[in-house]
Amino acid sequence: EELDLKVTCYRISVAVGRDEDGFANNFSGYYNFCKFIVLRDRMQNGFKAVKEIEMWVPKKATVNIACIDWMVDLMVKISEKNESAGEVFHISNPDPPQSSWLMEKSLKVLGKLGICVDGIKIFTYDRLKKDIIKTPESPIEKTFSYYQDYAESELRFDNANVKKVLGYMPKHPK
């Protein structure tokens, strides 16, 4: 027997901690990505206690992250509207931060976890063209390469359905 059910799909951004204090229940998502950067560098550089992190990104690359509480609140508002049934909603930050800003803020979080670094060095594609990058060899490097697309992309997700159902696009907290 076929049921006439409409399913609503939410495609969320990379979730980070709460807006007010950055709290996260676990570190399996974005923060894990940050730990991989540090671990990779430490394994390659003799476990130096403090060093710069090197990351290859486009000059103005953005990262589609959003605070978990903002995304949940937005999904609740959307679900309260009858016209949301059967639609797909991209729950994404309408003004995503640049990678360099995000990494600087992330280093503070990692510092609270006992992972110390001394700043961040962002390399752009201009420099990448001049240098040769080796193929990832270690398991940590291979795992890190899985996340490289997130660091390099400048994707923007379409929030059109959110705007259509709510009549506006809620601002993400800064």
Protein language model annotation of sequence segments:
Residues 1-15, 70-73, 79-82, 90-97, ...:
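4′-phosphopantetheine-dependent carrier domains
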Residues 39-55, 123-169:
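A hydrophobic C-terminal alpha-helical subdomain
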Residues 20-22, 101-102, 167:
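Short conserved micro-motifs at the rims of enzyme active sites and ligand-binding pockets
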Residues 7, 86, 152:
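Active-site lining segments that contact anionic ligands and/or coordinate catalytic metals
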Residues 73-146:
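Mid/C-terminal beta-alpha module of Rossmann-like enzyme folds, strongest
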